[in-house]
Amino acid sequence: MRELTMRLLILFFFLTISKLACANYVFIPMDAKQSNHLKAYGIAYWILKNDIEVDWLLNYRGGSFMCKYQPAIQNELVVRGVSFEIISDAQANSIITEIASPAVNYDLMKLEKYPKIAVYTPKSKQPWDDAVTLVLTYAEIPYDVIFDDEIMKGDLPKYDWLHLHHEAFTGQYGKFYG
């Protein structure tokens, strides 16, 4: 019995290793199978920040992400509680082929660089006072808060993405509290 248990453990070990050896991609679903959508966006940002390209599969299973497998990525996904699948080259190629079909409204966007993000909001606001900063903070996506002084100093070219609240330019800012 003990010998059989040992053989089964060894077999399990080698099957696990061979599965990982064939696991060439990480697939991060963004449909109902995703346990934490916001953290998944943060993971995509984290992967880009580590100089690894990410394929954003537009309209495919909710706009899923896919990238080359690396143990560090798998570890980060587990730590952040993000649902993922380890898939083979063949499975990744099948997804890419399906996306390329003119019969579907899917597209693949290759992300190569993480954006430097700024949010235009008063410095006195806490992350929970603003929906955008709340989401970015929760997703663990770094951002800078800028306001009028930074714009007047000419700091806008430092950023790839600037989020502006429409009420800041329509005279509606502060009406909620008012």
PLM regions and their residue ranges:
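Bacterial N-terminal signal peptides that target proteins for export
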Residues: 1-9
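Boundary at the C-terminal end of the N-terminal hydrophobic targeting segment
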Residues: 21-23
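Helical hinge/lid and interdomain linker segments adjacent to catalytic or ligand-binding clefts
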Residues: 25-26, 31, 35, 66-75, ...
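N-terminal, post-signal-peptide region of Sec/Tat-exported proteins
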Residues: 39-76
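Short phosphate-binding/catalytic loops that engage adenosine nucleotides
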Residues: 52, 82, 141
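Short N-terminal or domain-adjacent regulatory/targeting segments
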Residues: 80-113
